[in-house]
């Protein structure tokens, strides 16, 4: 199914990387369900600017009940079920190596918070999408990961561990759901220049990453978002269970 014919849910789709993903999908002609938690102003602006393509829904994706409500509202609005899900939403986190919790300071609550935001949120959206995707014999799920799983140069223990679990879930879901025509993949990036999460990152860190990257620049949110289009397009119809790293070649998959 071409992107222009799809209804795509983007969780956290009104800020940072999520906004870049939403804008890329709008440009491709897709209908986009923009989920947001607190970015109401931007979400409603998007809906006003693209009334035929965008439907904005506030929901906490770590709540199963709210996710189910989100899917029901989107289906009622567009008259058709969601075809694809991009699990992008990030619970509160800043990429600031100096301020990160050290291993001896980690708590069960902090670890669980990141796990819920990464794995449970993806589980809930996948479960909510499943019945309609099975009936259609088509579905696309893209989970957003991190290259820190392969190369933890800064040990963000809670965040990286949660994303590693999400990668495992991506692979097990792909194995389970492929028989129904549902492809599940992950797209992993490094530090992006810039998003809300990377605003605390000092300039010298961006310079260091650029000098260490084969493309000699730090990947932008727009560049990362463009790679998602491949996983949603017919060109990747035989691709599932994969983790594509989009970081300019810093980490070799």
List the predicted regions and their residue ranges.
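Catalytic loop of short-chain dehydrogenase/reductase
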Residues: 91-95, 102-114, 140-165, 170-179, ...
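Alpha-helical segment proximal to the catalytic Tyr-Lys
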Residues: 131, 175-176, 237
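A glycine/serine/threonine-rich, flexible loop-to-helix segment
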Residues: 44, 99, 179, 186-213, ...
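A short, exposed helix-loop element centered on a Lys and neighboring polar residues
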Residues: 126-127, 171
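Conserved glycine-rich cofactor-binding loop
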Residues: 7, 14-16
């Amino acid at each position: 199914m071409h992107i222009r014919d799809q209804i795509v849910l983007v969780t956290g789709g009104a800020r940072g990387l999520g906004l870049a993903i939403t804008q890329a999908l709008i440009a491709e002609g897709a209908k986009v369900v923009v989920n947001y938690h607190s970015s109401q102003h931007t979400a409603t602006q998007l809906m006003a600017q693209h009334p035929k393509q965008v439907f904005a829904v506030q929901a906490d994706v770590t709540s199963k009940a709210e996710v189910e409500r989100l899917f029901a509202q989107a289906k009622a609005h567009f008259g058709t079920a969601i075809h694809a899900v991009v699990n992008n939403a990030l619970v509160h986190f800043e990429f600031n190596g100096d301020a990160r919790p050290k291993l001896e300071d980690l708590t069960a609550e902090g670890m669980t918070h990141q796990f819920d935001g990464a794995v449970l949120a993806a589980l809930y959206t996948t479960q909510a999408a499943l019945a309609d995707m099975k009936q259609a014999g088509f579905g696309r799920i893209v989970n957003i990961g991190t290259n820190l799983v392969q190369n933890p140069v800064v040990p963000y223990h809670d965040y990286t561990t949660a994303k590693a679990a999400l990668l495992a879930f991506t692979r097990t879901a792909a194995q389970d759901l492929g028989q129904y025509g549902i492809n599940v993949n992950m797209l992993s990036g490094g530090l992006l220049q810039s998003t809300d999460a990377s605003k605390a990152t000092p300039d010298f860190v961006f310079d260091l990453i650029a000098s260490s990257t084969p493309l000699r620049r730090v990947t932008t949110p727009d560049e990362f978002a463009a790679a998602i289009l491949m996983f949603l397009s017919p060109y990747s119809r035989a691709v599932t269970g994969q983790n594509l790293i989009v970081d300019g070649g810093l980490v070799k998959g």
